[in-house]
Amino acid sequence: VCREGDITDLKERIIETSLVLFEKHGFHGVTVNDIVRESGTSKGGFYHHFHSKDELLFVIHDYFISYVLTKAQEANATSQTPTEQLQKIITSFVKVFDLYKPHLTVFYQESTYLKPQYEKAIKVKRDSYKNVLFQVLREGMASGEFRNELPVEITGMSILGMVNWTHKWYQKEGKYTIEEIADIYVDLVLQSLLTEEKKRSSTYRAYFLSKSAASHKKNNNEFCTGQTNQSV
């Protein structure tokens, strides 16, 4: 009899194995037999967890999308101000590129192969995440924290685009930790978004990079910013 922990471990082993194989050979270059052989399981074990290879690809995508959506909803429930909520949303979004880097690599390589029903399910979660972000921006503008002359949609999509591009250059062994990168993004966004009055408040300045930290980063900056494939 399989215990719950054994079943969970088997599912994770199948996912981890498929991530390596999909990244190396592509979605269509890998068969269920390949996954079964490399993960040391059986076809019965595979089909106990996944109806098909297509569902496995969906689960890989769903892992990190569900993570950022849950974190955004938690930020909404636990934050005192829109600024705090936005800081938490950006930070959790950035961290996904460290926590789920293999999943994201496969996502960007193989997302075109998602079946329509799975693509629709992913889109629902992505839209929900986007709506949470847009609502935070609206609330921040209504409360007087954020500049209300900025269009919500363009501002929100700019934040999403900036953070999404992290997958192009982030490396775990790079100069900056994922936490430092998150702090830099938060500073960039809030410096642009907060009203001048709020930026003068010590409460809101606490979200900015300290001068000593900024100086340290500047002195240690050795990478060429003109190369988009340069790891940081």
Task: Cite the ranges covered by each PLM segment.
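Hydrophobic alpha-helical connector segments
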Residues: 59, 74-103, 152, 156-159, ...
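Amphipathic alpha-helical packing segments from all-alpha helical-bundle domains
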Residues: 66-69, 73, 117-143, 153-157, ...
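Short amphipathic alpha-helical elements of helix-turn-helix/winged-helix folds
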Residues: 17-21, 96, 162
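Short helix-capping/turn signature of helix-turn-helix
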Residues: 50, 109-114
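Helix-turn-helix
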Residues: 2, 13, 21-55, 59
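Short, intrinsically disordered C-terminal tails of secreted or membrane-associated proteins
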Residues: 225-230
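Hydrophobic/aromatic-rich alpha-helical bundle segments in the mid-to-C-terminal region
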Residues: 104-109, 141-187, 196-216, 224
